[in-house]
Amino acid sequence: MDIILLERIPRLGQMGDIVSVKDGYARNFLLPQGKALRANEANKKHFEIQRAQLEARNLERKSEAEKIAEKLDGKSFIVVRSAGETGQLYGSVSTRDISEIITSEGFSIGRNQVELNHPIKTIGLHTIMLSLHPEVQISVIINVARSASEAQRQAEGETLTSAEAIYDVRKELLAENQEETFAENQQKALAKEMNDNDANSINEEA
């Protein structure tokens, strides 16, 4: 299908270019998202009439994207997920997860602006590209860890999937389990003591 580009599309062309693309790409992505028009005579005339307005709007959007890029480029975001000792996530981190965590920090980023070929499935520091505008791309760091403390260690350069780190994780898990067991035993002992006291009170009254 021949289309008229309404904005710059990487590896395809600039605004106003008439290019040929696969029908599915045009129908499912370019046309519904307002990035292109079918290249028929009516649309060609319409585009030429609207060209100045479209170019002005594009410059405005680019300027806004550049302002956001100044604050966002290179910024790090922490994502806490459950993972095994080797760092393999029990789930994954998707484009939706990334857009939501960045948006929660005060930046409006849609999932379609996150360039991620496959969901993240391991802990670690992951460099992710964001497309703020067809002509403005930046990168951010997604720090995926099992806890905030682990994220801090990763940010300081530690590799949490090393043998030493795995040993530390095991020790932390063991310590947590011991603390939980101790707390449970304390609660059981307290409950038993209260029950014994109640029984003694009943016997004394009798």
UniProtKB/Swiss-Prot annotation:
Keywords: Ribonucleoprotein, Ribosomal protein, RNA-binding, rRNA-binding. Residues 197-206 have a biased composition (Polar residues). GO terms for biological process: translation. InterPro entries: Ribosomal_bL9, Ribosomal_bL9/RNase_H1_N, Ribosomal_bL9_bac/chp, Ribosomal_bL9_C, Ribosomal_bL9_C_sf, Ribosomal_bL9_N, Ribosomal_bL9_N_sf. One of its GO terms (molecular function) is rRNA binding. PROSITE patterns: RIBOSOMAL_L9. It comes from the Bacteria. Belongs to the bacterial ribosomal protein bL9 family. Binds to the 23S rRNA. This is Large ribosomal subunit protein bL9.
